[in-house]
Amino acid sequence: LTLMLEQHAAKTHLRDLNVIESPAQQLRAAYDLMPTDTAEDWSIISRRMSALPAAIDGYIETLREGMRQQIVPARRQVVEVITQIARYSDKGGFFAVFAAEAAPAEGELPATLARELHDNANAARVAYDTLAEFLRSELAPVASEQDGGGREQYARASRGFLGATSDLGETYEWRLRER
């Protein structure tokens, strides 16, 4: 909780975009571990996909607020995330294939559910295209040329990833010795 409060105070959510672990990936990755054995599982997936456009709209608005406050991610990260998004939103990308190959462990999906899933997957693709266009036309032009965010930001990110505080200097020195 302390870390979350520190991150909020540092406004890291206003520039939360990178190529590894940010909402751009998390919103898509949420489907990776969802159960797919039954028609009910696929119905839940479809409902969650129907909410994806609103989630992406909210994410875009958060990044816009960062732009207003001049708290922006690195341009290199923005450009690479645009490339990642193409793999999600392409007609042969994640959402299209996921919906096209949807099937319970036994039998077939009801036709109405298959259509709903297809429609919601298409809406998710369009939402990701909207995100890519925002990144390309609005965020990339004002994004930072500087990678990273300095020692304090790195220390917070490290604590979040590890779940513990580490001595960054000691860790760096250890890495040099291990070469």
Range-by-range predicted roles:
Residues 1-179:
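N-terminal maturation segment of proteins
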